[in-house]
Amino acid sequence: MKQYLDLMRHVREHGTFKSDRTGTGTYSVFGYQMRFDLAAGFPLVTTKKCHLKSIVHELLWFLQGSTNIAYLKEHGVSIWDEWADENGDLGPVYGYQWRSWPAPDGRHIDQIANLMTMLKKNPDSRRLIVSAWNPALIDEMALPPCHALFQFYVADGKLSCQLYQRSADIFLGVPFNIASYALLTLMVAQVAGLRPGEFIWTGGDCHLYANHLEQADLQLTREPLPLPSMKLNPEVKDLFDFRFEDFELVGYQAHPHIKAPVAV
């Protein structure tokens, strides 16, 4: 994952210090892009060990349309704990916007189901887009969406995905986001009868928190290892039928985990 280390190095060398919502402070650049060929391996960071279980369960949780952390807690995933209320609710976050976007006439739009239908009927469409950024409901969300919008693209029988991430916590968040959307692309490709193409990550405010600099510098001393591969259960033909057991990460080698505090 040289691309990821290049981003981290770029921010260390060119980042501007900015204050932020959490009061921690960041070193930030605006606008950056990384490209990953999904045929060359599954883009899971190898310069520190990543928790794939959390990535998979979070994605399945999004696809369920859920906005309560009960499913995550049931499966030992704590990444949303800091933002949930006493009942485990997060407000109308990702899952709600993906699966139940409220329309002015009272309908709810299932963006994911619509996307899958459009992919099969008109794969050349330039409208293969899902947005989590709903300005009318931002204030009701425990945390506004950082990965705000993604678009699929089909060419030569291959499915590619581009994500726009408005706010990118490079050390803690971005490795999760890359792996999550790469996995989503593999899942959608299988169900749509396509081959995986590229995952393209586009970041807006790309930042390292001031209390992550030591960890980032340690990671930059490490040499990337060969990428693993991700196997999906070929029997799954519907996107919403995937379960945790349908994924197998093969050949993942990684340097030791690096701990860092979460800015809330």
Swiss-Prot record:
Biological source species: Pseudomonas paraeruginosa (strain DSM 24068 / PA7)
**Catalysed reaction equations from the record:** dUMP + (6R)-5,10-methylene-5,6,7,8-tetrahydrofolate = 7,8-dihydrofolate + dTMP
Q: In which pathway does it act?
A: Pyrimidine metabolism; dTTP biosynthesis
Query: Localized where?
Result: Cytoplasm
Q: What is its main location?
A: cytoplasm
State what protein this is by name.
Answer: Thymidylate synthase
PANTHER family per the UniProt record, alphabetical: THYMIDYLATE SYNTHASE (PTHR11548:SF9), THYMIDYLATE SYNTHASE 1 (PTHR11548)
Name the protein family.
Answer: Belongs to the thymidylate synthase family. Bacterial-type ThyA subfamily.
Give the GO cellular component terms, alphabetically.
cytosol
Could you tell me the keywords of this UniProt record? Cytoplasm, Methyltransferase, Nucleotide biosynthesis, Transferase
Asked if Cytoplasm is a keyword of the record, the answer is yes
Q: Does the keyword Lipid biosynthesis apply?
A: no
Quaternary context = Homodimer.
